[in-house]
Every structure is written in structure tokens, then in C-alpha cells.
Amino acid sequence: DSPEKLKAYLSETNTKILGIYTGANYIYTDAFEDEFFRIKKTIENMEKFGIKHLVLGGGAIRANGNVEEDYKILAKNLDRVAQFAKEKGIIASYHPHLGSAVETPEQIDQLFSLTNISFCPDIAHLVAGGGDALELIKKYRQRIEYVHLKDLKGSEFVPLGEGNIPLEEIIRYLKEDGFSGDWLVEIDGYSGDSYYACEASYKFLEQFFKK
């Protein structure tokens, strides 16, 4: 409601907003027109703040499961959003997510065979969805502009380096392959201390990134 206040706060704290995440009802055609209006407003506000990445998640799961036509509609509507974002100088990437129409490796392949949208791999969501995160990243490397780094232990998201995901191998692969995009660290619903999670994740990353 107060963009100037937010801009002032970001300036005072030397903080930058790297990306915005949004989901939508992509497969329900009538509902999507309202959703697209909302997303366009979000993109226009992002442009004012110089925010680089729009992360798109979701895609509803029907009560009886999704059908092939749903993925075609999802792909078409993602392309509409990506094109509008591109016109505003913003990179739109799709983020496979638990509890959505695209969470398994097979669903990721199905969607990406229908659209050229960029890929935002959330490492822990890829693994929790039954995938090999490194193999999916290698497979769709040319689509990747933005990475969500997250660790997983059992069914809980944990600070980087405390889970069972081979993050070191993934980070080294991307760096050695010349990845020059952006990285974001996040932990969904962590039950521990937030400050500790940030500190532990930062220390983990120090071995890969120079200050």
C-alpha cells in the first residue's frame, strides 16, 4: 500500500528483493483470466522495484486427478505470463511444488515438453517429489536462471547441510558449468530457531561462495 515507504526501507537497510513467488489456478480457464489480471499487476509492481525474478508455482490437482489436456492449458497460460513478464524485463520461471499438478519427475517432463518457460529448481521439493535433483538440473540446465537452495531431512525442511540432499555436488555442478544466475536460500515451516537456520545455512555456503 505504501511503495515509497518500502523503497525507503530497502534503501536504508541495503536490502534487495530478488524475486516474487505466486501461484494461480492455471487450468481453470474462466478463473485464470482473473488470476492473470492479478499476476500482471504483480509484474507491474515488480518492475517499479527492479525485481528480477517471478517464480510461478502451482496448477490445481483435480479431485479425480489431472488429464493430459490440463498440462496443455497449464503450459499455454504459463507462456502467457512469461511473455508479459519478459516485456517488462522480468524472468518468469516455473517452480515444481509439492501438492500441485507438477511435483514428480514425470509431471515435470510432461510440462516442459509443452512450454519453454524457465525452470526454478527448488532442490528439496524436487527430491520430496521423488526426483533426483541433480539429474533434473542437468536435464533442464539451459532453462535455469534462478535456484532455490533448500535441504531436506526425512519430511522436514532443515538448514543447508543438515539434511540428506547432496547439495555440495549440486552447487559444484552449477558453478563448474558456468551458472551465473541467482541463488535463494529458504526453509519452509522449519520448527527450529530462524536465526540459527540462517546462520547455519550461511556458514554452509561460505565454502562455495566468496564474500
Predicted regions and their residues:
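Active-site acidic/histidine proton-transfer and metal-coordination neighborhood
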Residues: E12, Y26-F119, A128, Y195
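Histidine-acidic metal/acid-base catalytic patches
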Residues: S11, E87, P105-D109, S113-C120, ...
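Active-site beta-loop-alpha junctions enriched in small/polar residues
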Residues: T22-I27, G59-I61, H97-G99, D122-L126, ...
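Aromatic-lined substrate-binding rim segments of carbohydrate-active enzymes
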Residues: S2-N14
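Aromatic- and glycine-enriched glycan-recognition loops and surfaces
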Residues: D1-E4, D34, P166
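Hydrophobic faces of well-ordered beta-strands that scaffold small-molecule active sites
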Residues: I17-T22, L54-L56, A92-Y94, F119-D122, ...
